[in-house]
Swiss-Prot record:
NCBIfam families hit by this protein: cyt_kin_arch
Full protein name: Cytidylate kinase
Key word 4Fe-4S present: no
Binding site for ATP: 7-15
Catalytic activity: CMP + ATP = CDP + ADP; dCMP + ATP = dCDP + ADP
Organism name: Methanococcus maripaludis (strain DSM 14266 / JCM 13030 / NBRC 101832 / S2 / LL)
Name of the gene this protein is made from: cmk
Length: 178
């Protein structure tokens, strides 16, 4: 089974992906972790690496390559803002493609708690990062990140806690057509 989980920062994609991975015994591959690892390898902050990635397409190409390679082996949770799009463009059909969304201030508060920084700083970083990513996705892939047409399931994650979001997805998985 291949499941993609996408969403903007602070929507709960990592928490949800980990819960799904544990429940269904699937490998969890996260584009964000790949991106963070690459930033560390180049001794850059996430903001610096995001700016670098805007003009260096090899960053996105490497992330894409690793995602496709993982999906070709099957049986995984593929987490990333473009995970669903990358598989679609590689003619790999996930069993379920999910997009999580949440109110921007809810996301900002979640990020500030996760990163242990004040809300104003988290908001500033979040806005900068999302603008950078949106620009990159449009220029490199001609993808509008706001286009949710490829997703089977879209969940407003600020309405439920992590377990509630997981329960909705679990019901969807349990009711997939064979």
């Amino acid at each position: 089974m291949i499941i993609t989980v996408g969403g903007l920062p602070g929507t709960g994609t990592t928490t949800t992906s980990k819960l799904l991975s544990e429940k269904y015994g699937l490998n969890h591959v996260c584009a964000g972790f790949i991106f963070r690892d690459m930033a560390k390898e180049m001794n850059m902050t996430l903001q610096e690496f995001s700016s670098y990635a805007e003009t260096n397409t090899e960053v996105d190409n490497e992330i894409d390559r690793r995602q496709v390679e993982a999906a070709q082996s099957g049986d995984l949770i593929l987490e990333g803002r473009l995970a669903g799009w990358i598989l679609k463009r590689s003619d790999i059909k996930p069993d379920l493609s999910i997009w999580l969304k949440a109110d921007p201030m809810v996301r900002c508060i979640r990020i500030s708690e996760r990163e242990n920084e004040n809300v104003d700083l988290a908001l500033e970083k979040m806005i900068s990062r999302e603008a950078s990513e949106k620009k990159r996705y449009k220029e490199i892939y001609n993808i509008e990140i706001d286009d949710l047409s490829i997703y089977d399931l879209t969940i407003e994650s600020s309405k439920w806690d992590a377990k509630g979001v997981f329960n909705i997805i679990e019901k969807a998985i349990d009711n997939l057509k064979a």
